[in-house]
Amino acid sequence: MVSSRPRRRKRASATQLYQTCKAAGTCPPDVVNKVEQTTVADQILKWGSMGVFFGGLGIGSGSGSGGRAGYVPLSTGSRAIPPKSLAPDVIARPPVVVDTVAPTDPSIVSLIEESSIIQSGAPSPVIPTEGGFSITSSGTDVPAILDISSTNTVHVTSTTHHNPIFTDPSVVQPIPPVEASGRIIVSHSSITTGAAEEIPMDTFVVHSDPLSSTPVPGVSARPKVGLYSKALQQVEIVDPTFMSTPQRLITYDNPVFDNIEDTLHFEQPSIHNAPDPAFMDIITLHRPALTSRRGVVRFSRVGQRGTMYTRRGTRIGGRVHFFKDISPIASSEEIELHPLVASPNNSDLFDVYADIDDIDENILYSTIDNNTPTSTYSLYPGNSTRIANTSIPLATIPDTFLTSGPDIVFPSVPAGTPYLPVSPSIPAISVLIRGTDYYLNPAYYFRKRRKRILAY
């Protein structure tokens, strides 16, 4: 429980009261005596100090520290301190002379002592003042002059043909001969002098194999777009212009072309009516986003309103989520599929690629029961692969021999003589069949009639 006791206000000091009430003459006596030092204690100190002088003992209204040197007993005198003797093997240093500084001397004292200049490095060369030495020769003849006649220039050309088919690239070709004079033209791929050096090369292989036996694919979390929070006002837009040119719903002006995929900024006057009332006071329209909400594809943009102005000129307002549903997401169609289940009986399985000689003839000529509308028959040799059977619905028909596949040839049974009626309803025509051709009986040939010519 919090106490409801009022706080105690600090009282003004005596000095503050004296400054405010002295001019009005309403100061209390104790405040005036304390500030003006006219109390009884102050008067005793003033009268006593006229006849008694205590010096620097510190006796007074201050702290009783006994002055700078402290309290010293009056009956005891000072004690002499014997000088310290030095060890016999220690040599005392000469005393340091202290230079006194007169009041007229400069206040800045140089601490750098003057020292002699020491020259370092090699000594400077000494130039002789006397003349140089003279050269004497035993001969007095004229010096010999060699006559070097100019000769014709000889051009030496050396060409090396490099055939990569018959030359090993690792073999270093010899350097062509070099003459003292002339021009040398060398044609080769490369020249290596000295022993060849083998540099180990590392193969850079990008390993895409997993580093662990059970790798977990790293799926980066997609940023969550908070478009449906309580801080955003939800406004549905029906006009399709919102998707192509949203600036037409905010301002009547024709601004310079802006990329609608980026954030749009609008500078509107204080009094402005937007073409669409839903976009009133919109100063910023952020970039679009495609989301899915309750089975539909939704086109969304977040806008910032500038409803109020602050004293500094800043516009503040709420945030709005404008959205338009594009199209619904159709649910997936369900297709009824028949399960492919193998027969529990292994004797009903048959491999269509098995050898026909290994199949029992009793199975080949087995018949199908007429009373069963749907039957499954297949053959199964022991060494063949297990294959799932297939159910085929059959109608009620006479007995039929089973054919298991197109790759199996069964023996055919010869058919009997077709039945002919005893008394045919139409006369039979005799046809003689001989080989691949036939002809009618000459008795059935019609005679050629002569065409009569009528005279007019």
UniProtKB/Swiss-Prot annotation:
**PTM comment for this protein?**
Highly phosphorylated.
Q: Which GO terms of the cellular component aspect does the record hold? A: host cell; host cell endosome; host cell Golgi apparatus; host cell nucleus; viral capsid
Compartments where found: Virion; Host nucleus; Host early endosome; Host Golgi apparatus
Q: What is its main location?
A: virion
Keyword annotations of the record: Capsid protein, Cytoplasmic inwards viral transport, Disulfide bond, DNA-binding, Host endosome, Host Golgi apparatus, Host nucleus, Host-virus interaction, Late protein, Microtubular inwards viral transport, Phosphoprotein, Viral penetration into host nucleus, Virion, Virus entry into host cell
Q: Which organism is it from?
A: Human papillomavirus 7
The entry assigns this protein to a family as follows: Belongs to the papillomaviridae L2 protein family.
Tell me, how does this one assemble? Interacts with major capsid protein L1. Interacts with E2; this interaction inhibits E2 transcriptional activity but not the DNA replication function E2. Interacts with host GADD45GIP1. Interacts with host HSPA8; this interaction is required for L2 nuclear translocation. Interacts with host importins KPNB2 and KPNB3. Forms a complex with importin alpha2-beta1 heterodimers via interaction with the importin alpha2 adapter. Interacts with host DYNLT1; this interaction is essential for virus intracellular transport during entry.
Stated name of the protein: Minor capsid protein L2
Q: Biological process GO annotation list? A: microtubule-dependent intracellular transport of viral material towards nucleus; symbiont entry into host cell; viral penetration into host nucleus
- Task of the protein: Minor protein of the capsid that localizes along the inner surface of the virion, within the central cavities beneath the L1 pentamers. Plays a role in capsid stabilization through interaction with the major capsid protein L1. Once the virion enters the host cell, L2 escorts the genomic DNA into the nucleus by promoting escape from the endosomal compartments and traffic through the host Golgi network.
Disulfide pairs here are: C21-C27
Short sequence motif named Nuclear localization signal, residue ranges: 1-12, 446-454
GO MF annotation: an example: DNA binding
Q: Which domain of life is it from?
A: Viruses
